[in-house]
Amino acid sequence: MMPFYPVGSADLDVPPNLIGRGTGVCVSAYTHTEEGYDIEEMEAQWAQTYRLINKIRHNKDQLARYETLGLEDAEVVAVAYGANARTVKTGVLEARRRGVRAGFVRLITLWPFPDELFARDVPYVVCELNYDGQLVREVMRSAPDGKKVRFMGKSAELNTVAEVAAGLEGVARTGRIPELPYIWTEVR
């Protein structure tokens, strides 16, 4: 049987693609040997997982996808992903129209996380479609001062443009998100 990648190869980053006509490859979720047989031994599981994790880490720049706006002069940066990102971006544009130097980061992929986007020492406002704050923890971990990261969580509906603009304006002026109905600002 043809191995999944050269046996004993030091280059374990990208095994050749064997899927296609005439290859006889069975695709499954099980960890497998170099020959393609399912295994349960921890050492082989670890080696396979290690290879995949390192493959992602070494190619982080190609895999992490995001969109940015106005980061060059930003005094406060809004962060969002998914369905919420569109209204947050419009809220950033509204805040800029009001004189707040607001920036925007839309994460398209969440892993690998683009830590380098959060290297600036400015407040970050993470707008999420939940009350728990899942993404905010990653931003807190990546930012130089996690205490400058603010959370605007909302459940059952998207943040409105007015809420985002008011939140960014509040953080830029006072360091706090103003009291807004249905907005959760504590990370639990």
What is the predicted role of each segment?
Residues M1-R188:
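Flexible, low-complexity linker and terminal segments
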